[in-house]
């Protein structure tokens, strides 16, 4: 269950950073700055979460290739 809490925790941190940047964005080109930084944070979170969860719960179990055939499954 630690994977759920890790992903949710990182999501909360990224969301807080997005809200903070929404409030503190520079005044010139504010829409460009907001969309660039918030979309960057969102995409980085998605890539991290997908990679983290794929490594935590792989679809194909790893197999050892250095075993003798009689000990292999």
Curated annotation (Swiss-Prot):
One of its GO terms (cellular component) is proton-transporting V-type ATPase complex. GO terms for molecular function: ATPase-coupled ion transmembrane transporter activity; proton-transporting ATPase activity, rotational mechanism. Subunit of the V0 complex of vacuolar(H+)-ATPase (V-ATPase), a multisubunit enzyme composed of a peripheral complex (V1) that hydrolyzes ATP and a membrane integral complex (V0) that translocates protons. V-ATPase is responsible for acidifying and maintaining the pH of intracellular compartments. It is found in: Vacuole membrane. The chain crosses the membrane at residues 4-24, 36-56. Coiled coil: none annotated. Pfam families: ATP_synt_H (PF05493). This is V-type proton ATPase subunit e. InterPro entries: ATPase_V0-cplx_e1/e2_su. GO terms for biological process: cell wall mannoprotein biosynthetic process; endosomal lumen acidification; Golgi lumen acidification; protein-containing complex assembly; proton transmembrane transport; transmembrane transport; vacuolar acidification. Residues 25-35 are cytoplasmic. It comes from the Eukaryota. Keywords: Hydrogen ion transport, Ion transport, Membrane, Transmembrane, Transmembrane helix, Transport, Vacuole. Belongs to the V-ATPase e1/e2 subunit family. Residues 1-3, 57-73 are lumenal. It is a multi-pass membrane protein. Its main location: membrane. V-ATPase is a heteromultimeric enzyme composed of a peripheral catalytic V1 complex (components A to H) attached to an integral membrane V0 proton pore complex (components: a, c, c', c'', d, e, f and VOA1). It comes from Saccharomyces cerevisiae (strain ATCC 204508 / S288c). PANTHER family: V-TYPE PROTON ATPASE SUBUNIT (PTHR12263:SF0), VACUOLAR ATP SYNTHASE SUBUNIT H (PTHR12263).
């Amino acid at each position: 269950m630690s994977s759920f809490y890790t992903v949710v925790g990182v999501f909360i941190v990224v969301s807080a950073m997005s809200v903070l940047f929404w409030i503190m964005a520079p005044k010139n080109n504010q829409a460009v700055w907001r969309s660039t930084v918030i979309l960057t944070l969102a995409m980085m979170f998605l890539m991290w979460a997908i990679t983290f969860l794929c490594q935590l719960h792989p679809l194909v179990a790893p197999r050892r290739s250095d075993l003798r055939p009689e000990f292999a499954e």
